[in-house]
Amino acid sequence: MARDKIALIGSGQIGGTLAHLVGLKELGDVVLFDIAEGVPQGKALDIAESSPVDGFDSKLTGANSYEAIEGARVVIVTAGVPRKPGMSRDDLLSINLKVMEQVGAGIKKYAPDAFVICITNPLDAMVWALQKASGLPAKKVVGMAGVLDSARFRYFLADEFNVSVEDVTAFVLGGHGDTMVPLVKYSTVAGIPLPDLVKMGWTSQARLDEIVDRTRNGGAEIVNLLKTGSAFYAPASSAIAMAESYLKDKKRVVPVAAHLNGEYGVKDMYVGVPVVIGDKGVERIVEIELAGKDKEAFDKSVAAVQGLVEACKKIAPDLLGR
């Protein structure tokens, strides 16, 4: 039986890490795409040369033409530019919107049946634009945000309590930015909700609040430490978890930037919510009841995403007709 083809659009730090993880997990054959000649070919060859050591048989190729992604079952998009000092939000939106339009056209032509995972920032606006540009069903196009944000929250909690990360469950909703909503009430250690752990004396509310703030600023913390780049290991692992749930029909419940059409009171926008991912894509949106501060924070997050989407509509009004 032929292996699944997994196309990675963008061969930077995340793209290269994704390719290596696909090989290590033997999820399929990899096509690394990039507009920079030689870069995807070089990275693909480097990773392929590690296969005898790591013991995987996935085939890796690099390409500069969208033709190479033909028939891909999964497409993961990291193409675009990061925000640089002095660059306004609209500058970043304008540049990466053009990239999403080009990528969307390539996917539409060569991989119209794929499950598409977008990682490009600003995430919630870019995944919206990518779905419009590709014309793929909304349930087959998602953004990678919540899995990463929740993983950071889980790691910080496990570190605080000195327990295994495997025993910590945590959910982060909303946009992928500083308005994200880490849900303390729905986060647990071995099934014990965090508020109960505060009562049990495992931690204090003030300490929990600090961890929530650190989660919101998790990406910025790494950027400030690296100084010349941003996170790529954890984002790549997060996208692979989503792809694996689709490819293996695992039906995992994971928070992703999903297209909402009335759920949570949101219409035609991509916002981070828990979903079930199976071989049909997003098979169910899990609608958690939000109240009080959580509801306020979620609404504020949605408003921030709405602002980004409105800016996209002004920059690229032709997307609306798609």
Curated annotation (Swiss-Prot):
Name the residues annotated as catalytic in the UniProt entry: H176 (proton acceptor)
Where, by residue number, does NAD(+) bind?
Answer: G10, S11, G12, Q13, I14, G15, D34, N96, I119, T120, N121
What Gene3D superfamilies does the record point to?
Answer: Lactate dehydrogenase/glycoside hydrolase, family 4, C-terminal, NAD(P)-binding Rossmann-like Domain
Q: Which GO terms describe its biological process?
A: lactate metabolic process; tricarboxylic acid cycle
Q: What is its EC number?
A: 1.1.1.37
| Alphabetical keyword list | NAD, Oxidoreductase, Tricarboxylic acid cycle
Family, according to the entry, reads as follows: Belongs to the LDH/MDH superfamily. MDH type 3 family.
Q: What does this protein do?
A: Catalyzes the reversible oxidation of malate to oxaloacetate.
Q: What is this protein called?
A: Malate dehydrogenase
Supply the gene name. mdh
